[in-house]
A protein has these predicted regions:
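Nucleic-acid endonuclease domains
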Residues: 1-59, 63, 67-257
């Protein structure tokens, strides 16, 4: 599938964002820059397949691909009244305060975006349907700044091998846990890098007053080289990382497709 067509799909399907940001924010409704449905469409486009049309059952794509989408364009908390407020709000719609914080119990207003959106992967399904599964397809939306005026958002798409040794180890430990069946998979965390994701494309979506524009920074659908593990995780190994986890103590927001 051509790079130009992917660009056209993203821009065409996000064309309503200028109005959504304006009116959704007025009524304190969160705005999904690229929602789960669109992420599945994008996955189908670049893999030359069709969406599964499962509505919660079966694979997200007809070729056996499973799409996981997450976003760091997240709501914040009013520093005065404590209520949750849309990312794009300049003032709290409840009390008019202009100070915000990322967490309700946070001290100070320096950090306003939790950036803790995650992907949810079922440990049970990972093993139960592994033969039919082709791969995991991960996508993430990130604001280039945490300011309410931000109109530029990075969108990145990776694939994750279903036979990843680290993912298998993590999933088995999670499955054996009595507390939860779900892997709370954090973008850019140690589990992410040790699972050896492969970037297929990344770019920036700009929301103009009357349209959107997507520009690629990288696009290679044939890329099979896993991301380089950052220096901070270079000394980590899967066994010790998984053994150090306190299973069942879920943090952050995760998207279940």
């Amino acid at each position: 599938m051509t790079q130009l067509f992917v660009k056209q799909v993203i821009e065409g399907c996000t064309a309503g964002l200028p109005a959504q940001i304006k009116y959704y924010t007025q009524f304190n409704q969160p705005v999904k820059i690229i929602d789960d449905t669109l992420s599945e469409v994008i996955g189908a486009v670049i893999n030359n397949t069709l969406c599964g049309g499962s509505g919660g059952g079966g694979w997200d794509a007809c070729d056996g691909g499973e799409q996981k989408n997450s976003s760091h364009v997240q709501s914040k908390f009013c520093a005065d009244c404590g209520k949750k407020v849309s990312f794009f709000a300049e003032h709290c719609p409840h009390c008019g305060c202009s100070g915000f914080k990322a967490k309700s119990k946070q001290k100070g207003t320096k950090v306003t975006n939790p950036r803790d959106g995650r992907w949810g992967i079922s440990a049970k399904s990972h093993f139960q349907y592994k033969e039919e599964l082709k791969e995991y397809r991960l996508s993430l939306v990130e604001p280039l700044s945490d300011d309410h005026n931000c109109r530029e958002f990075r969108f990145t798409y990776w694939t994750l091998d279903k036979n990843s040794e680290h993912l298998d180890l993590y999933a088995q430990a999670q499955l054996n846990s009595k507390k939860s069946n779900h892997i709370n998979f954090q973008p850019y965390g140690v589990d992410f890098y040790l699972s050896r994701p492969v970037m297929k494309f990344t770019g920036v979506l700009t929301v103009h007053e009357d349209r959107t524009e997507f520009d690629f920074d990288f696009f290679d659908l044939d890329n099979n080289t896993p991301l380089e593990i950052p220096a901070e995780f270079a000394c980590k190994d899967s066994k010790s990382v998984v053994e150090s986890k306190k299973f069942g103590k879920e943090r952050g927001e995760w998207v279940r497709n």
